[in-house]
């Protein structure tokens, strides 16, 4: 290992020197260009652009080398892009930002990966140079310039100009051994950035319903992914804990529990309490007037009314926490009330910069590209959701100094959020080239009738009812399989919770979040197909293989350091490559925030493992006696590597596997 680190350090030093040299040359060219008298100025500008491209490429290589010294798992796709990027640059140095397309091959006959850049380069040469060159000829030229590397066994040119890449078996074997010795390491991300995720966000005094399920599950999983990748993550729960509805709630509290300041009111069912207060607000004029007075006193921070507000919030908070505990979700509460004192400054800042118009007493802000303005102050002087969302955005950017902001909110809020983001950019709070702000939108949950998921009476489904139903059905499923006869009561309880909550989460996460999805307990608890039930059962079977061979974790760790993982059988080779695709899967999700890609990968990994296990004996037994005759340790190591990746995948998805099911 020390020799490899020394070699990497030497390569880093050489690259740093070249980068310094190139930087100096670029500065020289800049200065020369500024004279404005050179007849070959255009040529110098072209050369400058090429040098910048080369500089960027070297800096990326430098980052890759640095990542290798800290044991991050190699992203094979990125490594191949680096290699082919160097080959294309060497073959066609005159091209600026040539296309770089490397993907896993879909069929074994096309190798392990494919580089399909030749077609794009053909078009560029025809368009910019008026050169007609066949993609195959370009592919041949690229392959001749592939630098010496540790991972490519051979390349072949197929069809019109596809470059089929075959990986070296010793390279794949070493990466698998490294995975087992060092554990699952995150992909290299360079500079550590701060990520702020806004998710879940229920309303105080209302119960969480099935509509909150998606935001909560998706947001939690995104947080886990960014945390694993090494980002500084702030998980925010933007609670609806302020507004006019608190006036009627406080007025009703005063009537029902007049001594609430000294005796904690026994509000058992906050939903019923809310409905009672709403009915009175709609039907009793005197109560309605008192409710408005309560709002004014609350907003003026009257201590008695703040106490009433806190009591109501606490009841809700405890109910929310029961659900968060079930789903293993962690959040930092920062509701609308947190931003109330910032509203005045938001209005003033937009006024000072000349963005505010007055319309029927309202203060509004038009944002270029959006037809509906933001209302930042109502005609009665009150603030709006627009004001509070702008205040939250400003605080996250300027006070929290977030580099990446992600709002996990339903698709129906898309136009509103995009308008708020654009307003923040317009006023100068952030530059989208520097700060990434994304609305991670999602569709609605449908019932099996393909309509919005409701109870038989037409009410919204309470989230706690849904989770309890999941627990009941999971236990029924386990008892149908007679697991209650082989598991201890503690193991059975753990399996029940793993299956129930794992299946509910996976059913959501395995669908593209942009689409609506049909909620079906029968489908999600099916142990066939791409479900959590199938993956959890597969995981327990994999973990049992070494245990049944009397091989413990210590023995496997020792074997990982000493034994070579043989990949001669086609199913061993297929499984080994599939395991090592994990870093590129994670990188893709960090880019597009589509978590179903991870679910698809885990299902592919489980089915690839099944193919391997059906064709390659890990433990060979005597057919008559059942006595173990031979243990193929390298295959047990492949089992362990598969389970290790699956466990990390489950962790990112928020699913808790069990050793026995």
Curated annotation (Swiss-Prot):
Gene Ontology annotations for the cellular component aspect, listed alphabetically: aminoacyl-tRNA synthetase multienzyme complex; cytosol
UniProt-listed Enzyme Commission number(s): 6.1.1.19
GO molecular function per UniProt: arginine-tRNA ligase activity; ATP binding
InterPro entries reported in the protein's UniProt record: aa-tRNA-synth_I_CS, Arg-tRNA-ligase, Arg-tRNA-synth_N, Arg-tRNA-synth_N_sf, ArgRS_core, DALR_anticod-bd, Rossmann-like_a/b/a_fold, tRNAsynth_Ia_anticodon-bd
Region (Could be involved in the assembly of the multisynthetase complex): 1-72
Keyword Nucleotide-binding: yes
NCBIfam families the UniProt entry points to: argS (TIGR00456)
Protein name (Swiss-Prot/TrEMBL): Arginine--tRNA ligase, cytoplasmic
Species name: Gallus gallus
Encoding gene, per UniProt annotation: RARS1
């Amino acid at each position: 290992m020390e020799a490899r680190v020394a070699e990497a350090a030497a390569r880093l030093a050489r690259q740093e020197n070249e980068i310094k040299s190139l930087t100096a040359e670029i500065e020289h060219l800049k200065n020369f260009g500024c004279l404005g008298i050179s007849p070959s100025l255009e040529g110098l500008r072209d050369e400058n652009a090429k040098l910048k491209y080369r500089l960027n490429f070297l800096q990326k290589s430098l980052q890759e080398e640095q990542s290798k010294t800290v044991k991050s798992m190699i992203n094979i796709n990125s490594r191949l892009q680096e290699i082919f990027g160097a080959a294309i640059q060497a073959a066609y140095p005159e091209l600026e930002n040539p296309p770089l397309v490397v993907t896993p091959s879909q069929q074994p006959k096309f190798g392990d990966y494919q580089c399909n850049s030749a077609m794009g380069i053909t078009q560029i040469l025809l368009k910019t140079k008026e050169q007609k060159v066949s993609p195959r000829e370009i592919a041949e030229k690229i392959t001749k310039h592939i630098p010496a590397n540790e991972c490519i066994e051979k390349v072949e040119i197929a069809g019109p100009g596809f470059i089929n890449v075959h990986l070296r078996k010793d390279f794949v074997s070493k990466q698998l051994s490294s995975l087992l010795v060092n554990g699952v390491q995150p992909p290299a991300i360079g500079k550590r950035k701060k990520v702020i995720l806004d998710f879940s966000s229920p309303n105080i005094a209302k119960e969480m319903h099935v509509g909150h399920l998606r935001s909560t599950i998706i947001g939690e999983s995104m947080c886990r992914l960014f945390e694993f990748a090494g980002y500084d993550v702030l998980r925010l729960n933007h609670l609806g804990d302020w507004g006019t509805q608190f006036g009627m709630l406080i007025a009703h509290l005063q009537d029902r529990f007049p001594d609430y300041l000294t005796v904690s009111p026994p509000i058992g069912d906050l939903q019923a309490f809310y409905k009672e207060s709403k009915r009175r607000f709609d039907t009793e004029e005197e109560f309605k007037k008192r409710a408005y007075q309560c709002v004014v006193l609350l907003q003026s921070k009257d201590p008695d009314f703040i106490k009433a507000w806190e009591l109501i919030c606490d009841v809700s908070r405890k109910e929310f926490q029961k659900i968060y505990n079930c789903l293993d979700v962690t959040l930092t509460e920062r509701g609308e009330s947190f931003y109330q004192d910032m509203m005045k400054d938001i209005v003033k800042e937009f006024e000072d910069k000349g963005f505010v118009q007055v319309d029927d007493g309202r203060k509004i802000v038009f944002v270029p590209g959006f037809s509906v303005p933001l209302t930042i102050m109502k005609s009665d002087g009150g603030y709006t959701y627009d004001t509070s969302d702008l205040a939250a955005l400003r605080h996250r950017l300027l006070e929290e100094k977030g580099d990446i902001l992600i709002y996990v909110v339903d698709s129906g809020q898309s136009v509103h959020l995009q308008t708020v983001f654009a307003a923040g950019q317009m006023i100068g709070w952030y530059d989208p080239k520097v700060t990434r702000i994304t609305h991670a939108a999602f569709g609605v949950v449908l019932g099996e009738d393909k309509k919005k998921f409701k109870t038989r009476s037409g009410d919204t489904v309470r989230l706690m009812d849904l989770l309890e139903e999941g627990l009941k059905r999971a236990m029924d499923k386990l008892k149908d399989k007679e697991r209650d006869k082989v598991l201890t009561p503690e193991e059975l309880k753990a399996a029940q919770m793993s299956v129930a909550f794992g299946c509910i989460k996976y059913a959501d996460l395995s669908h593209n979040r942009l689409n609506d999805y049909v909620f079906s307990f029968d489908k999600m608890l099916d142990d066939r197909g791409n479900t959590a039930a199938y993956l959890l059962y597969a995981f327990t079977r994999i973990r049992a293989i070494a245990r049944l061979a009397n091989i413990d974790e210590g023995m496997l760790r020792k074997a990982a350091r000493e034994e070579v993982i043989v990949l001669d059988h086609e199913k061993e080779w297929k499984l080994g490559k599939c395991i090592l695709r994990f870093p590129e899967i994670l990188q893709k999700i960090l880019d597009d925030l589509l978590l179903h890609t991870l679910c698809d990968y885990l299902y592919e990994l489980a089915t690839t493992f099944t193919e391997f296990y059906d064709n390659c004996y890990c433990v060979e037994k005597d057919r008559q006696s059942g006595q173990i005759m031979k243990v193929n340790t390298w295959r047990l190591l492949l089992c362990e590597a598969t389970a290790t990746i699956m466990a990390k995948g489950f962790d990112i998805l928020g699913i808790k596997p069990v050793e026995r099911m």
